Amino acid sequence: PGIEELIRSDLRDGLQLEMDRAILNGSGSSGQPTGIMGTSGINSVAIGTNGGAVTLEKIVDLETAVMEDNGAVNPNAVRYLTNYKVMGALKKLRAGGSAAGDGAFLYNSDLSAIGRGGTPAVLNGYGVLPSNQVPSNLTKGSSSGVCSAIVYGDFSQCIMGTWGGGLEITVGEDADDFSKALTSIRGIL
């Protein structure tokens, strides 16, 4: 690809990551939307006073809390979203409740024996998607900066409005840039 397409691709990737971050963690101020993690009144399930390891019981509690509030407008769009740290723990979780030897694994990541096609990643019957935009540095009680989040819900109900016809790239045309051998580029999505 040409340099212009590489720059466009890099800007687009950066803007998409920022949109993901804002949808999950946006502060609701300074032009940011209020993200899922900062929205008041949504259900949450705490694993313990000081955090703790994910268990099947807590997974079911989370599913139940969301579904009791009619949280699945489109049941086919209900998913889990979490970071890779939690994904690793989920891959070890068994139906018997422990990581060692009790029952079948709850997380199915067969993906046709790693040909990456076929069975999607599933936890307790629902799809699971990883994202490093889901925090892994949260604090709960005395566990400071080491706790993670799992988000569960109908992601078809997550809407972020944008305007314009796609990625707009503006190259700075300031004469001062030319004399200093600078190029300024701004991407707006």
What are these regions (language model features)?
Residues 1-189:
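Structured, hydrophobic secondary-structure cores that serve as assembly/anchoring elements
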